[in-house]
Regions:
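Conserved catalytic cores of very large enzyme subunits
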Residues: 1-173
Length: 173
């Protein structure tokens, strides 16, 4: 458990150190302190509807509590099947007042995704992403940070993965 927790904490540090463009203009004025939309969701249900809380879920809660980093956004997804012990631990962390974890309702998210045309299995596989959006992971693209360099993708496509700026082969031939 300690080794797994250490690896999770290293992941938290990687997320926190993600290079992001400096916020300028209206973004700086209105939301200079927002995170860059990386979300860790834990809890919820499995695609077949069983409780999704497991040993890693508790390690993630411990990581949230010990690291106290604003990124990644740390979320717990609560369903009717969520163990009371898990919910209590998440509430203990939340009451410390540093803004995490966020709490989401599994059933509400699932219904939102079904209403958007997703299958029940895909809807159960989804969760929160971005600010507070709900997405069905694995069945749709979610690029919320705005840091996808589409012109670079186009350039690499045109030149068979070769990057003319660096002189390196970065993509597929």
């Amino acid at each position: 458990d300690e080794r797994a927790k250490e690896l999770l904490e290293c992941l938290w540090v990687k997320f926190y150190n993600q290079p992001a463009p400096v916020k300028v203009g209206i973004t700086l004025k209105e939301s200079a302190t927002y995170t860059d939309f990386a979300n860790i969701n834990t809890g919820g249900v499995t695609p077949d509807g069983r409780d999704g809380v497991n040993a890693v879920s508790y390690l993630i809660l411990d990581c949230m509590d010990e690291m106290k980093l604003v990124q990644p956004n740390s979320n717990v997804t609560i369903s009717k099947k969520t163990p009371a012990r898990f919910l209590k631990r998440a509430c203990e962390i939340s009451r410390k007042g540093w803004g995490q974890p966020a709490f989401y309702n599994t059933e509400a998210q699932t219904m939102e995704l079904i209403n958007a045309g997703k299958s029940l299995e895909d809807a159960r596989r989804g969760g929160s992403s971005g600010c507070v959006e709900t997405g069905a992971w694995g069945s749709e693209a979610y690029i919320l940070t705005g840091y996808l360099n589409i012109p670079k993708v186009f350039q690499l496509t045109l030149y068979n993965g070769f990057d003319k700026e660096s002189g390196k082969q970065l993509g597929l031939k």
